[in-house]
Amino acid sequence: KEFGVGLTLEHLTEGHMIANELAKEKFPLAVGPTFGHATKFELQNKTWETPGILAKAGCHVSIITDAPVIPLHPLCAGFAIKAGMDEFDALRAVTINPAEHIGIADRVGSLEEGKDADIVIVDGNPFDVTGVIRHVLIDGKEVE
């Protein structure tokens, strides 16, 4: 804060334990990865409830996976919803919030005129495995 440096708090797998303190600080929070076993001491209390608890406390939450190749974000958002996170908070946690956290929200993260048109259109709930992808657009062009 003293030097005005942008800061994002990463991982926060046990952030639910200090949600009120984190909400006071107003730092962007990147929560995850939540998949896997709690083999490290600092993972003993990780839970899919963490993103929802932090969002309800007023935190600006992104869901992260540490999986650079396989796009697990929708699945992680679905697990967070199942654990009590609001669906719109979960959607924001994998779209506009991460874009804001890394400073590219002027181009991506939401549907607005002038932004990149990277869109997935789903028949059904996008966070439910029964949802069917109908269209994918990258830069406004449909891809097969």
Q: How would you describe each model-predicted region?
A:
Residues G6-G15, T34, A38-K40:
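Catalytic beta/alpha-barrel core
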Residues E14, A19-E21, I138:
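Charged/polar interaction segments and conserved charged motifs
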Residues E2, N20-V122:
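His/Asp/Glu-enriched, well-ordered alpha-helical/loop segment
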Residues K1, L9-T13, V132-H135:
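Composition- and surface-driven signal marking solvent-exposed, interaction-prone regions
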Residues T8-H11, A93, H101, E142:
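Functionally constrained cores in energy, signaling, and assembly domains
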Residues E14, P68-V69, D128:
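Glycine-/small-residue-rich active-site loops that bind phosphorylated ligands and cofactors
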Residues E100, E112-E144:
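C-terminal cap of metal-dependent C-N hydrolases
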